[in-house]
Amino acid sequence: MPEIIYAAAPGASNGTTTTATGGGWGSLLFMLIFFIAIFYFMIILPQRRREKQFQQMISQMKRGDTVVTIGGIVGKVIDIKKDTVKIKTANSTELEITKRAISTVIKERSQENQEG
């Protein structure tokens, strides 16, 4: 029984030695490149796609289109400026909002009927 305890004790040697070998800088560099690639494909690339879609949506917006803001306000576009859009809500209130505050652009119905 004492042999079992001795063999299980830390630092006990049975005549063979093992050395831990590290991966060195190569494996560290590989892991770093791997995580940067994952970060790029999971975060940066989709964000660029969303930004491109948003810019396209805003550039195609015109007077008469209905927009929904990020706050949930729905209105009809009555004027478009460089950075802002003036909309008219259901109770005839005119609001000037930034283009960044627009969540969705709903095309004018008469134009959709002519196209489709």
UniProtKB/Swiss-Prot annotation:
Key words, A-Z: Cell inner membrane, Cell membrane, Membrane, Protein transport, Translocation, Transmembrane, Transmembrane helix, Transport
Q: Where in the cell is it found?
A: Cell inner membrane
Query: Carries keyword Cell inner membrane?
Result: yes
rRNA processing found in the keyword field = no
Pfam families in the record, alphabetically?
YajC
Query: Which GO cellular component terms, listed alphabetically, does the Swiss-Prot or TrEMBL entry include?
Result: plasma membrane
Superkingdom, taxonomy of origin:
Bacteria
Kindly list the residue ranges recorded as spanning the membrane.
25-45
Family matches, as InterPro entries: Preprotein_translocase_YajC
- Write down the membrane topology: Single-pass membrane protein
GO biological process annotation, one example: protein transport
Family, as annotated:
Belongs to the YajC family.
What this protein is reported to do is described as: The SecYEG-SecDF-YajC-YidC holo-translocon (HTL) protein secretase/insertase is a supercomplex required for protein secretion, insertion of proteins into membranes, and assembly of membrane protein complexes. While the SecYEG complex is essential for assembly of a number of proteins and complexes, the SecDF-YajC-YidC subcomplex facilitates these functions.
Complex and partners: Part of the SecDF-YidC-YajC translocase complex. The SecDF-YidC-YajC translocase forms a supercomplex with SecYEG, called the holo-translocon (HTL).
Which PANTHER family does this UniProt record tie to the protein?
Answer: SEC TRANSLOCON ACCESSORY COMPLEX SUBUNIT YAJC
Please identify the protein, giving its name as recorded. Sec translocon accessory complex subunit YajC
